[in-house]
Amino acid sequence: MADNVTPLASLSLTHVYYNPDDPISLLCAWLALVPQALCVVYATLIWSTREAEVILMFAGQLACEAANFALKRLIKEERPARIHSTGGKGYGMPSSHAQFVSFWAVALGLFLLARHTPREQQQQQQQKQKQRERKKQVTNVKTTTTNGSGNGSLFKTLTDSATDLERYAHEPWSFAHRFVASLGALVLAGAVAWSRTYLGYHTEKQVLVGCGAGTLCAVAWFVVTHVVRQSGLLGQILDFPVVRWFRVRDLVVEEDLPQAGWEKWEEQRVARREVEERKKAL
């Protein structure tokens, strides 16, 4: 009876071996889950924004994974002996984790530094911000007249501080902001790649080759998507009935992701406050 029992297998997608007595090893085990977390981020952004650029980046990420799958079976280099003896599956050259995060970091950096140019949006935001500031100034004058000079001045100071904070939060990222974000992505990618050698899943050579392959795939994919955009092919694809049915758009190149729907929300918020003020006046 016992001989007929099928031996169990583990799902290695999130199965990470680490040293429980080493806190750095535990951190590296969590870093090993970054690619899975990024896939969740991709899926969430695609579903919530329907942005063509996000879809293109995820398509490139999948193509990079396919290249890693092919390279591993072409090179057929084993993993380090220590991890191989514990049951580590698959070939080790190049590191799929290193290739995945390298593609993501480089592709994100190329988008933020070379493709994302929210110029027109910045001008529109500045005009709308000035209009909101004029309305707030009128409100401040009324408040000062009603509450007296002392209370009104304090209220005006607090309102001005809130306005400055709101203006900063709603401004599109400058090149310096985008550079820092790109640098942060590279640091995270480097940490994930380093964790693979620390845990013993790959040799340094396998990780470096993975980083190089991911970087090469990201640059090549950026060139491909640039040609697709410049040739007008992307615009034609976005006009397909099926694509329009899914409401795919291409705004993030010139618009920040948080900006989508913000003007509509602001208009509704202002309209709601005006209705409340009219009710109070009655």
Curated annotation (Swiss-Prot):
Biased composition (Low complexity): 138-148
Highest taxon, organism lineage: Eukaryota
Keywords for the protein's UniProt record, in alphabetical order: Endoplasmic reticulum, Hydrolase, Membrane, Transmembrane, Transmembrane helix
Organism: Neurospora crassa (strain ATCC 24698 / 74-OR23-1A / CBS 708.71 / DSM 1257 / FGSC 987)
Family matches, as Pfam families: PAP2 (PF01569)
One term of GO molecular function: dolichyldiphosphatase activity
CC annotations in GO: endoplasmic reticulum membrane
Stretches that traverse the bilayer: 26-46, 93-113, 173-193, 207-227
Subcellular location as annotated: Endoplasmic reticulum membrane
Family according to the record: Belongs to the dolichyldiphosphatase family.
Primary subcellular site in the record, as a coarse category: endoplasmic reticulum
Biological pathway: Protein modification; protein glycosylation
UniProt name for this protein: Putative dolichyldiphosphatase
InterPro entries found in the cross-reference section: Dolichyldiphosphatase_PAP2, P_Acid_Pase_2/haloperoxi_sf, P_Acid_Pase_2/haloperoxidase
Catalytic activity: a di-trans,poly-cis-dolichyl diphosphate + H2O = a di-trans,poly-cis-dolichyl phosphate + phosphate + H(+)
Region listing for Disordered, in residue ranges: 121-153
Membrane topology: Multi-pass membrane protein
EC number: 3.6.1.43
PANTHER family: DOLICHYLDIPHOSPHATASE 1, PALMITOYL-PROTEIN THIOESTERASE/DOLICHYLDIPHOSPHATASE 1
Gene Ontology terms: biological process: protein N-linked glycosylation
